[in-house]
Amino acid sequence: MAQELSEKELLKMEVEQLKKEVKNPRALISKTGKEIKDYVEAEAGNDPLLKGIPEDKNPFKEKGGCIIS
């Protein structure tokens, strides 16, 4: 799609995008970093990658074995 547009059209789209982005509220990383860290630590108990999935609720556990007769 970008190849079909002229350079002027591409620059116009970029300016429009930058106008949208400049309206986004900005915050200091020292504040947001702490908020993210606190959230991750608070939710760590519910994270299946950290605590694992119970065997009875694991959708990827093999249902049965192979029977050869």
Swiss-Prot record:
Its main location: membrane. One of its GO terms (cellular component) is heterotrimeric G-protein complex. It comes from the Eukaryota. It is found in: Cell membrane. It is a lipid-anchor. GO terms for biological process: G protein-coupled receptor signaling pathway. PROSITE patterns: G_PROTEIN_GAMMA (PS50058). The modification Cysteine methyl ester is found at C66. Residues 67-69 form a propeptide. GO terms for molecular function: G-protein beta-subunit binding; GTPase activity. It holds the Pfam family G-gamma. Keywords: Cell membrane, Lipoprotein, Membrane, Methylation, Prenylation, Transducer. Coiled coil: none annotated. Belongs to the G protein gamma family. Guanine nucleotide-binding proteins (G proteins) are involved as a modulator or transducer in various transmembrane signaling systems. The beta and gamma chains are required for the GTPase activity, for replacement of GDP by GTP, and for G protein-effector interaction. This is Guanine nucleotide-binding protein G(I)/G(S)/G(O) subunit gamma-T2. It comes from Bos taurus.
